[in-house]
Amino acid sequence: MALSFVSSTRFSKMQYGIWHSGSFTQRVSVRCCEIANEAPRPKSKLQVGSPIIIVEAPKVIKTAASMPCLRANSGLVKPGDVGRIVSRKPKDLWAVRLSIGTYLLDGKYFKALELDEGDSD
């Protein structure tokens, strides 16, 4: 998706019953349009309910409770821990349910867990 900007200048002595002193107002219109040669963005594998695995231990962790608590990570969340995404927050912040509780984690600390759907023959 591309954005195009169009600038227009208006000069009017009387607008909405108010006399202006001859100054002009700058207005900008923004239009969104699809461009055919633009490659589609890949959809994230992460969504609510997706299993994840911690790849790097965060230095501080924040609980996802109604009254959140920020504390130093003293070995509570370790690389290799597995959990599920409960919800998504703005700016790549995710509420993740781990075995020790639900925490708000940045997306750089975990990745989607690839589950093998193998045949049981």
Swiss-Prot record:
Source superkingdom: Eukaryota
Q: Could you mention a single GO BP entry for this protein?
A: NADH dehydrogenase complex (plastoquinone) assembly
Q: Write down any Gene Ontology CC term.
A: plastid
Q: Where does it primarily localize?
A: plastid
Q: Give the matching Pfam families.
A: CRR42-like
- Keywords for this protein: Chloroplast, Plastid, Transit peptide
Q: Which InterPro entries match?
A: CRR42-like (IPR021495)
Report the gene knockout effect.
Answer: Specifically defective in the accumulation of subcomplex A, a stroma-protruding arm of the chloroplast NADH dehydrogenase-like complex (NDH).
Q: Where does this one sit in the cell? A: Plastid, Chloroplast; Plastid, Chloroplast stroma
| The keyword GTP-binding is annotated on this UniProt entry | no
Assembly with partners or alone: Biogenesis factor component of the plastidial NDH subcomplex A.
| Functional note | Required for both formation and activity of the chloroplast NAD(P)H dehydrogenase (NDH) complex of the photosynthetic electron transport chain. Functions in assembly or stabilization of the NDH complex; probably involved, together with CRR1 and CRR6, in the incorporation of NdhJ, NdhM, NdhK and NdhI into the NDH subcomplex A assembly intermediate (NAI500) to produce the complex NAI400.
The protein here is known as Protein CHLORORESPIRATORY REDUCTION 42, chloroplastic
Organism of origin is Arabidopsis thaliana
Q: What is this protein's gene name?
A: CRR42
